[in-house]
Amino acid sequence: MLLQAFLFLLAGFAAKISASMTNETSDRPLVHFTPNKGWMNDPNGLWYDAKEGKWHLYFQYNPNDTVWGLPLFWGHATSDDLTHWQDEPVAIAPKRKDSGAYSGSMVIDYNNTSGFFNDTIDPRQRCVAIWTYNTPESEEQYISYSLDGGYTFTEYQKNPVLAANSTQFRDPKVFWYEPSKKWIMTAAKSQDYKIEIYSSDDLKSWKLESAFANEGFLGYQYECPGLIEVPSEQDPSKSHWVMFISINPGAPAGGSFNQYFVGSFNGHHFEAFDNQSRVVDFGKDYYALQTFFNTDPTYGSALGIAWASNWEYSAFVPSNPWRSSMSLVRPFSLNTEYQANPETELINLKAEPILNISSAGPWSRFATNTTLTKANSYNVDLSNSTGTLEFELVYAVNTTQTISKSVFADLSLWFKGLEDPEEYLRMGFEVSASSFFLDRGNSKVKFVKENPYFTNRMSVNNQPFKSENDLSYYKVYGLLDQNILELYFNDGDVVSTNTYFMTTGNALGSVNMTTGVDNLFYIDKFQVREVK
């Protein structure tokens, strides 16, 4: 939840931006959730209704405008497959016009520890929301319960259940800790740089257990914490605890981002294995990550979704009548053998996308088992493209070839607009930097050209997933969805999420692959298809 003072500064800047900048494009993403109208930010209250087979997503919502503002509500959406979402009526509303139902989480009170439920409510649908009630005077933790499976909520009459005489105490994330048979809450003392850990028997009375403080990137404040047990990729029967903390403003690349720490939890204290802050997503547009309280085991035990924007420029991105999208849902695991460099293995969070689609077009194979040269670029036009595409690229670098550091030795992909090819995304890999780059600045949209915070160019360090026969192999999967690009490197060892904006109707569909150096890149596989 963004600090009000920071929003005041943003509002001042917004007043200087022409209104036309906010309405130049309105192409709605196909597989990333967007509200029907209004403003959306943090995901909240994620849970799975095992009785109905339905996923629930709540979110910070201003239905009255396309910028953040009070009163702020909990919007609501549901899904049968974690890809296609149905907007639902507002779930939780604040009590005053100058207040907000700020971020929080959902639990399923299977054993009715709260006493809110009777036997007529299926234990799998005993939903309790834990959320921050924000007023100009304070931020306090409230609870509300649902008797209809998460669609409407009744506020607990004795709220607040937790207060700290502070205007910067928010974002409770609650889970059940089976060894102690207690509820555990993490909540942010935002400007003290503390994530406080509380325990409870009944969701109503909370005891402070410990604090995880002053770790990693501090930025301006901590927000949206989360603590979850994440399985090992190598051995799913083993796991470690992961503490997620959001930072805004003050991200290394500007604005907002998510960091995480790997460690152990004993019901009282979270102890990180080291003091290293690790980055969840290396893009500019992935914030306020939250994980689901429970899941369908088909998808694993640790699933999360984030807001696909950045507070530096979120109020100005072109969109109408809604503003902002969510990321795809991602299953998380821990790669305990992640090769950070040739001499060091680290524990690393791994993420892959959930994309349940039945109407995708056929894969168009551009290149297989071929060496790329300057003369043989590969081109394809997906003439009926909707602007939602996915691609897979497996390539290798010839390590025996000597390249001058002064030469930009690149493999580039050019995703061009079908109506106007002068608008395009360029992305690719450059050998000397050993990084995958993105250029999202080739657009005629005024916001892209003029907003100083919308960074046009960025990159992500890449390491090969294997090396053999003098070739170092790399892999990238990408999903382009109208104005959101998600990139997954080496099966999700590294992830980057970024928004982009083209003129309305200029769907990306023409794809070119080029290189600036002969015989340096070997293309094992490159294929693209349309998502409908």
UniProtKB/Swiss-Prot annotation:
One term under GO cellular component: extracellular region
TM helices/strands, residue ranges: none
EC assignment: 3.2.1.26
Keyword Glycoprotein: yes
Glycosylation sites: 23, 64, 111-112, 118, 165, 275, 356, 369, 384, 398, 512
Alphabetical keyword list: Cytoplasm, Glycoprotein, Glycosidase, Hydrolase, Secreted, Signal
Residues forming the catalytic site: 42
Changes after translation: Isoform Secreted is glycosylated. Isoform Intracellular is not glycosylated.
GO biological-process terms attached to the record: sucrose catabolic process to fructose-6-phosphate and glucose-6-phosphate
Reaction catalysis annotation: Hydrolysis of terminal non-reducing beta-D-fructofuranoside residues in beta-D-fructofuranosides
InterPro entries: ConA-like_dom_sf, Glyco_hydro_32, Glyco_hydro_32_AS, Glyco_hydro_32_C, Glyco_hydro_32_N, Glyco_hydro_beta-prop_sf
PROSITE patterns: GLYCOSYL_HYDROL_F32
Xref: SMART domains: Glyco_32
Residues binding substrate: 39-42, 60, 102-103, 170-171, 223, 311
Family per record: Belongs to the glycosyl hydrolase 32 family.
Protein name in UniProt: Invertase 1
Native source organism of the sequence: Saccharomyces cerevisiae (Baker's yeast)
Gene that this sequence comes from: SUC1
